[in-house]
Curated annotation (Swiss-Prot):
EC number: 7.1.2.2
Location, primary (coarse class): membrane
Entry binding sites for ATP: 169-176
CDD domains with a match to the protein in the record: ATP-synt_F1_alpha_C, ATP-synt_F1_alpha_N, F1-ATPase_alpha_CD
Organism: Orientia tsutsugamushi (strain Boryong)
Family indicated by similarity: Belongs to the ATPase alpha/beta chains family.
Function comment: Produces ATP from ADP in the presence of a proton gradient across the membrane. The alpha chain is a regulatory subunit.
Protein's name in the database: ATP synthase subunit alpha
Quaternary structure note: F-type ATPases have 2 components, CF(1) - the catalytic core - and CF(0) - the membrane proton channel. CF(1) has five subunits: alpha(3), beta(3), gamma(1), delta(1), epsilon(1). CF(0) has three main subunits: a(1), b(2) and c(9-12). The alpha and beta chains form an alternating ring which encloses part of the gamma chain. CF(1) is attached to CF(0) by a central stalk formed by the gamma and epsilon chains, while a peripheral stalk is formed by the delta and b chains.
Site note Required for activity, residues: 370
One GO CC term, this protein: plasma membrane
Compartment(s) where it occurs, according to its Swiss-Prot or TrEMBL record: Cell inner membrane
Amino acid sequence: MQLKASEVYEALKQQLEDFDELSELSEVGYVISIGDGIAKVYGLSNAYSGEILQFSTGTKGIVFSLKDNLIEVVVIGSGDQIKQGSQVKRTQTSLKVPTGKELLGRVVDAIGNPIDGKGEFINPTYLDVEVKAPSVMCRDSVNEPMYTGIKAIDALIPIGKGQRELIIGDRQTGKTAIAIDIILNQKRFHLSDQEKEKVYCIYVAIGQKRSTVAQLVKKLQETGAMAYTTVVLSSASDAASLQYLAPYTGCAIGEYFRDNCMHALVIYDDLSKHAIAYRQISLLLRRPPAREAYPGDVFYLHSRLLERAAKLNKAKGEGSLTALPIVETQNSDVSAYIPTNIISITDGQIFLESELFYKGIKPALNVGISVSRVGAAAQIKAMKDIASSVKLELAQYHEMEAFSQFGADLDSSSMQLINRGRRLSELLKQSQYCPFPVEEQIIVLFAGINGYLDKIAVSKVKEFENNMLEYFRIHNPDIMNEIINTKKITEIISSKLHQILQEFVKSIEQCS
């Protein structure tokens, strides 16, 4: 049978007209080797660093290294089913995670999947895990206070919205306790109608036991703090890749609030374990080790994360993201590699000492080493005036107490200085889960620096403090509102405080 050229032409033309464009064009590569969560893949020469790849088993991976003939992929999660020869497909996208108010009250894993049994998210906003930090022109100076509810911090080491403040100390010194107290303190702002005062919290648990995080979540639920908090969990049993991703996921969730004219607080607990997870990945990728076997870019690992915390300017909506990274030290050695790195990145550090903790001073804050570089600008004038006097009194007390150790005879003024310093130190002690509103902190410290506790026994200081605040709440709530509204201690407020405190001290003396 002889076909005519015109018939062949018509048949081909008809076939081409019926042919749709390729609905999906995918680049496929193959696994050459797999081990310890690292897959070497051949055939994806166009893949880019940070791209998400899809394995034929359904598992995902991130491109970490690009080499001449192959790429190295870090498997997200368990790669048990991936074998040599398994197909790998490009997705041409970077990792995105769900964000938004829908995540409040939920517990998610390192890539944003819910793990609390409350079902999937309905309509979340997906954001990139890795984004550039806001530029200098988008930022504003830190000028709003981030109230922690902890007297020693709000007075001596103040934190502002958009700041990065490191919490550092040995294990079991109360680092997580401080972070949780700060979350609990935000509850009073969420009960008010002022949206600008509300702070949404993200707690990122890296390399912790699931049982520990479960207790923490239970506490947040009991106190009602879970309503404005999201917990991102990458436990000790998770793969190093998930522990590496968890802080960036938490940061992306916080950035949703920052970029939508709201305030967010993200706590990274802790970045020591995050650095260890990254070290593990880097050594498996055969990257050259540097100091303490960490890779050379470990500084960039944390700087690109913490630089995303910012206070945005008016043109960008005045939102903020505050970061509180936690770092665990060994034997109070702050000169180790990771602690020094993060100290140099952050805007200050809260240093907790095990010696103070064992003495019963909680929070076990070393005021001498702790510092806040930008938070003082955010302090209200009332607290700033009180805090300057407290710092001076405490500095003189520590100096005089050290001098008294030599057994020298002290005059009456020096003894008075030591006695007042002891009472001020006692005033700064605080139980866990008991955050103080700023107006109550101001009243307590005002009483301390003006000598109203000088005749009170040190063991009775906490009792005096509780009774005094109760007296103010019942008989003089207006003075508290006045302090909050004016944000400073005027002569009128000062005279009122003196009058009320004198009446209270007199009533105590009469009772005793």
